[in-house]
């Protein structure tokens, strides 16, 4: 039962995170690990890009990147 609850919470967090503009301060998101810039730019929509472990608004949305 606890495992089921954890899964539901995880899916909820993922779904909320994929909403447009779901960033900590509107510019940089730090609670997700981004992949390399080339992978991010290839796989993601053009609104965020990876900068280290941060998602920075500009080129692609790192939520769609392979981790």
Curated annotation (Swiss-Prot):
Tissue-by-tissue expression: Expressed by the venom gland.
GO cellular component: extracellular region
TM annotation in the entry: none
GO molecular function: potassium channel regulator activity; toxin activity
Comment block on domains: Has the structural arrangement of an alpha-helix connected to antiparallel beta-sheets by disulfide bonds (CS-alpha/beta).
Function recorded in the entry: Inhibits voltage-gated potassium channels.
Name of this chain's protein: Potassium channel toxin alpha-KTx 6.16
């Amino acid at each position: 039962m606890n495992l089921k609850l954890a899964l539901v919470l995880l899916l909820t967090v993922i779904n909320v995170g994929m909403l447009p503009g779901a960033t900590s301060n509107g510019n940089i998101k730090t609670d997700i690990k981004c992949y390399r810039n080339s992978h991010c730019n290839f796989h993601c929509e053009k609104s965020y890009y990876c900068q280290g472990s941060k998602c920075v608004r500009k080129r692609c949305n790192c939520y769609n990147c392979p981790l």
